[in-house]
Amino acid sequence: MIEVERVMTLDHPLTDVVGFLSDFANTEMWDPGTVTCDRVDSGPVSVGAEWRNVSVFRGHRTELLYRLARFDPDHLIFVGRNKTATSTDDLRFEDAGGRTRLIYRARIEFGRLARLATPLLKREFERLGDEVSERLPRAVDHALGTSPPRGDQPL
């Protein structure tokens, strides 16, 4: 199993950030490996909603079916599966005075054969985690509008 965690502060209110990130199709905007991510069911986003995510990792194309397993006002969990892996994206949110603190944890569990490569892949997943921590705040800003100026930023 590989686990990567990043903590980010986003310059938008918690409810807006959760609303944006609850639609897993938006991973196209912030996950560096995602090529496409399409909703496979319809209706409002709620527990049980599903997305087909196609991504490229180390030159290999892979497809996972993700399901929204938890949808709380301050906690989202998406679980993606295919024949060789289970991927869990766990997003916890905390109000930070009108801003949002996001604790993002990605966990990948490989099947038998792929499990042997886990130690070799850890560094690559850490690199992807770094990219997510750069891209996700920009995607949120783009989707929700430019972040408002704070006291420590020039106007």
Per-segment meaning from a language model:
Residues 45-51:
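Short coil-to-beta transition motif at edge beta-strands of beta-rich domains
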Residues 107-155:
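A conserved amphipathic terminal alpha-helix motif
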Residues 25, 29, 59, 137-144:
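Secondary-structure transition/hinge residues
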Residues 17-21, 27, 51, 68, ...:
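Hydrophobic pocket/interface hotspot
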Residues 1-40, 46, 154-155:
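Hydrophobic ligand-binding cavity/cleft-lining segments
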Residues 43, 54-103, 107-110, 142:
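Hydrophobic-ligand binding "helix-grip"
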